[in-house]
Structure formats: structure tokens, C-alpha cells
Amino acid sequence: MSRLWLIVPAAGQGRRMGAECPKQYLDIAGRPVLAHTLARLHEAFPEAALRLCLDPDDTRFSPEWVPFADWQRVAGGRERVDSVENALASLADVAADDDLVLVHDVARPCVAVEDLRRLREALTTSPEGGLLAAPVADTMKRADARGHVVHTVSREGLWHAMTPQGAPYRVLCRAFAHARGAGVVLTDEASALEAWGLAPRLVPGRRDNLKITHPEDLALATRLLAGDPASRRATGALSDDSLADEARS
């Protein structure tokens, strides 16, 4: 049976938050965002091995926040893609070609355990990789340089990409290498797979798997982790069945 490897890039500075510290160290109920995220991943995959990408000069990190027995600190890069590539390189001597690698944003502490497990199960039969995602529900507008509407964009077939995203180890490595050689700008793992000609599988996930990017996101994540029903309604969080129904509509 293949192993599961988790990569969590956590070397970013989170400048859009405008906070005094990187967003992975912002406090939620007495613990940093990073600790909440790792705890959620561990609840779903206690047997997984973790590669945690941190800034080499990071002095805020504490190993006590890592619940995994098998984990390793990896030097983070200038950009997220650099951190992920460093983590993939660290697995060269230990990961098998068909081992599953999942990459998760450290700033997504609200990801549902059932979604994590469902993603892993889906990717056992998806050699081209895949990702958690949610169908676009809002009306989408294309804007001009002045911030005025140019036209309404059809939301048919549009999805919000989330994380985790992943693929078998060899597939992900080759996709990243191809993108690097072709000069493709990568925003996530799925874009690397796409650039290599693959079609990653979209696995429906809850909408409350939000990424903490702006100050209001932190407040919402705090309420979500506390189990506030109103906050779940505000994010449009749906059950697995309703997400699947919407994806088909």
C-alpha cells in the first residue's frame, strides 16, 4: 500500500493581512493558525508523513504544534511554488513513485476532516491528480481597469479551487519540472498538472474551507472553528450531497 505524504507550505509573510506577524502565527483560541491546520490534517491522516516548509529564519515556530510522529522541517522558498519544490526534493530518497502527495495551504485551518478523507479516496482512482473545490455559486463579473463591469461571466463549469491538491509523487514531480522548464507561472499544484496536459479531478468540498487572507477571514475562521452555525451559513457551507447536486446542476 502506498504511503501518504503531506506538504504544508508555511513560509509566507501574509502581507495582505496587514498584521504584525505572518498569518500562520495569528491567534485563534490561544493557538496559532498553523497549529489548528496541522491538527485538522492529523485528525484525518494520523499515519501520514509531513513536510513542513518554513522560512529558514523563522523563530516563531514551535515543534510542539506538530502532532505528526513522522515529520520534517524543510526550507521554504521565496514563493509558494519554491517551497513545494523543496519539499518534493526532500522526498526523493524516501517516496515511491505511486505514493500520494497532498499539498495544503497552512492558512486553511477549517478544512473538513470528511473532505480530506474523501479527497484521498477519490485520488486512489485518479492518476492525474485532483483537488478539493466548490462550484461557483455567485454571479461573476469581468471588470475593466477602472473597476467597471465589462460583462457577466457565465459560471457554468466554474469552480473555486481549494486545497489540498495532489497527485502521485512521480506525476507531481514531473509536472513541476515541466512547468519550470516551460516558464509557466504556477499558482497551485493543479496548474502544474494542467500545464503538463493532465486534467486533475475536482472533488466537491465544503465552502467553509476558507483561506485566511484578509483580517475579516480570521474572524470568520475563529467562529467556524468554534462551531458557530451562523458562520457556516454565511460561508454557504453545504453538505456533501448538496455540493454534488450543485456540481451537476
Curated annotation (Swiss-Prot):
Q: What class of enzyme is it?
A: transferase
Q: Could you state a single Gene Ontology molecular function term? A: 2-C-methyl-D-erythritol 4-phosphate cytidylyltransferase activity
Keyword list, A-Z: Isoprene biosynthesis, Nucleotidyltransferase, Transferase
Q: Does the keyword Nucleotidyltransferase apply?
A: yes
BP-aspect Gene Ontology terms: isopentenyl diphosphate biosynthetic process, methylerythritol 4-phosphate pathway
Which Enzyme Commission number(s) are listed? Answer: 2.7.7.60
Sites annotated Transition state stabilizer: R16, K23
Recorded catalytic activity of this chain's protein: 2-C-methyl-D-erythritol 4-phosphate + CTP + H(+) = 4-CDP-2-C-methyl-D-erythritol + diphosphate
Origin: domain of life:
Bacteria
Q: In which pathway does it act?
A: Isoprenoid biosynthesis; isopentenyl diphosphate biosynthesis via DXP pathway; isopentenyl diphosphate from 1-deoxy-D-xylulose 5-phosphate: step 2/6
* Site positions per UniProt: Positions MEP for the nucleophilic attack: R155, K211
- Which family does the entry's similarity section mention? Belongs to the IspD/TarI cytidylyltransferase family. IspD subfamily.
Query: HAMAP family, per this entry?
Result: IspD
**So what does this one do?**
Catalyzes the formation of 4-diphosphocytidyl-2-C-methyl-D-erythritol from CTP and 2-C-methyl-D-erythritol 4-phosphate (MEP).
Its name, as the record gives it, is 2-C-methyl-D-erythritol 4-phosphate cytidylyltransferase
This protein's gene is called: ispD
